[in-house]
Amino acid sequence: MTRNSQNEPQPTIRTAGTSDTSNIARIYVDSWNTGFVGLMPARQLTDELCARWERDITVPFPHRWWVAEADAALVGFVGIRPSRDPIDPALGELDTIAVAPTCWHRGIGRALLAVALSYLRADGYRQAVLWTLAHYEQGQRFYEAAGWQLDGGVRDAGRQVRYRHDLRG
């Protein structure tokens, strides 16, 4: 196992499977409730949420999901898909990325994002988009540090903003 600049173990990233569903749902809820405090209502870990994640991660290609493991535990996940935006069907989309809050700032999100972008490129997309909350500053800093730029897209009465990433460079 390699280590990052803070001497933290780097995660192992692998394709997500149905056995990961409950951990993906837990990470989703934990990261939502920690990251979106004051921005969105808290979420609860429910059977319905686990079932939703099982449906999402078993959708066939071109939807893809990966998980990150560190210290023998699932600590994050990421998914890609064709863009749901009607602006351009040739766009890829970063569907969701989440890391367990206890593992933030350890490079796990960057590692997951690198895998997602690599596969979007390999799938032939020249650009990708993502949506995030307009006032989610921590997430926006993360995306901007990775080369994403606001492109002016808004939805949900301005509560969400769209970022775009050029995959050609």
Residue ranges and their predicted role:
Residues 130-139, 156-159:
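Conserved beta-strand-loop-alpha-helix junction that forms the acyl-donor binding cleft
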Residues 144-153:
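Conserved acetyl-CoA-binding loop of GNAT-fold acetyltransferases
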Residues 100-102, 106, 134-135:
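Active-site acidic-Proline motif in GNAT/NAT acetyltransferases
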Residues 120-132:
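Conserved GNAT acetyl-CoA-binding A-motif
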